[in-house]
Amino acid sequence: MPRNIFIVGPQCAGKTTLIQALEQLFPLPGVADEPVMVINEVVRDVMSANGFSSHDIGSDKWDQLQALTLEAQCHAEEALNGRWFVSDRSGIDPIIYAQLGRQSKQKLLDTKHWKASRQRMQDGLVIMCEAGNLSWLSSDAVRLNYTDSVEWEALNKHFIKLLEQEHIRFVVLQKDVVCMKERLDFVVAKLIAYERL
């Protein structure tokens, strides 16, 4: 079974579109003999079930949202134990976004949910999709609304710093790689390379 794949990074970096294409690509002879299971972005379900919105940033509700999202992500991964999956986001995403509210990231880093998710990420292939392609920037009730790209692109550094701090090996899918075939080729090449480690 190939390594599980975690597609992480700031919003509007092409993660969900990439995952949809990966789902169609597999099985792929010589790489993966079985279809891949998909963990869809859990935060949308958590927000819908609990009445959260992106307007809750900076409030206690924002902090609660990040904790519930981390827990839901961990449960989604555990539900596919023994199955090959690709995950739209990961346990690290709510930790990054917790920094935008009152809650410190340390509180989430100390949870059992993060420790379990981190181990799966350390054993998997982590693709960090880089933000910065302005044509992809959008907002809705879930996504934060950025007035310019500077703050949005700064999230790249937060993801990289935390991945390194948590000893999670990752590769960056650069923002200028916009062709879907090139994005898919990048992921497949990294998956093959990681299987040889």
Where do the model's predicted regions map?
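C-terminal accessory "lid"/substrate-recognition subdomains
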Residues: E164, I168-V172, K181-L197
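The conserved Walker
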Residues: Q11
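A glycine- and Lys/Arg-enriched "phosphate-lid" helix/loop adjacent to the NTP-binding pocket
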Residues: R102-C179
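Conserved substrate/cofactor phosphate-moiety recognition/catalytic segment
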Residues: Q24-A72
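Conserved lysine of the Walker
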Residues: K15
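Post-Walker A alpha-helix
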Residues: L18-I19
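Conserved nucleotide-sensing/catalytic segment adjacent to the nucleotide-binding pocket
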Residues: G51-L100, K105
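Hydrophobic anchor at the beta1->P-loop junction of P-loop NTPases
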Residues: I7
